[in-house]
Amino acid sequence: MRILIDGDACPGKYIIENIARENDIEVIIYCDTNHILKSNYSTVVTVDSGFQSVDMVIVNKVRSGDIVVSQDYGVAAMVLGKKAYAINPKGYIYHEGNMDKLLFERYISSKVRRTGGRTSNPKKRTKEDDKRLRENLFQLILNGKVYKGEDW
């Protein structure tokens, strides 16, 4: 098991690294050339910048049993198809039961934006988000994939 992080947009990296360190799990953070990241624990892999370049590298590198941390529903859907686990940086676990709803909401939001409409901005990160990430990531690690998180 490894933890692969979409580092272009992942608050909470320090929480993930601390849990991984405690459990002796390799962490790989992927980012593009527009984001310079450093870590004392994780391996940082920088890829060329481009539309979804980090996402595609993660999908190509993920293995069965890995955990992927990403805000992108499309990435989550693809890694679930590869028998890996996916969790949002706010600690929500992606699973087969919520992917259709999330992907449909993403589709509707993109349609609204294309027609000039506005969608809501993401909410600011809270201490509850940190707690949820810590608890649910730990559950994924301990149990492989026993879903005990909150649904969306």
UniProtKB/Swiss-Prot annotation:
Segments traversing the membrane: none
Source organism, top-level taxon: Bacteria
Similarity section: Belongs to the UPF0178 family.
HAMAP family hit by this protein: UPF0178 (MF_00489)
Protein name: UPF0178 protein CKL_3490
Higher taxonomy: Bacteria, Bacillati, Bacillota, Clostridia, Eubacteriales
